Amino acid sequence: MNKTYLPPQDIEGKKWYVIDAEGQRLGRLATAIAMIIRGKNKPTYTPHMDTGDFVIVVNAEKVTVTGKKSSQKLYRRHSGRPGGMKTEVFSKLQARLPQRIIEEAVFGMLPKNSLGRKLHNKLKVYPGSNHPHEAQKPEKLTIQTIPGGER
């Protein structure tokens, strides 16, 4: 019988990565971010523990989708009251709250339990190119989300 590896829980060992979302495909970018936040890119990955790193996403307003998704993809939210369902297409939400698009895509790929709720704090999304996390000395991480492309 195999035993699950139990890594030491040290917050100092967590890395910070900064990812530029300009021109990147939404789904492929969100998949890569979720893997880093969850810690699946490390040999010390443990399913029931937080072994992932922090991710800062800049230029969230410049993320792209393919096909007609910008006019057909719907984002829904509910106020909790009867008739309180609000729907918004991708292009309008991108103009209003561009960081919410990446947050929803990544959070949908994380576990729906207490560990998943803790992992939400590891994602920092900013619409512009500036972020307030220079003190953490984040590493620049490039992710290729365009198949056969230069990014």
UniProtKB/Swiss-Prot annotation:
Entry-linked Pfam families: Ribosomal_L13
Function (record text): This protein is one of the early assembly proteins of the 50S ribosomal subunit, although it is not seen to bind rRNA by itself. It is important during the early stages of 50S assembly.
NCBIfam families from the UniProt entry: rplM_bact
Record keywords: Ribonucleoprotein, Ribosomal protein
Residue span of region Disordered: 126-151
GO biological process, one term: negative regulation of translation
Protein name: Large ribosomal subunit protein uL13
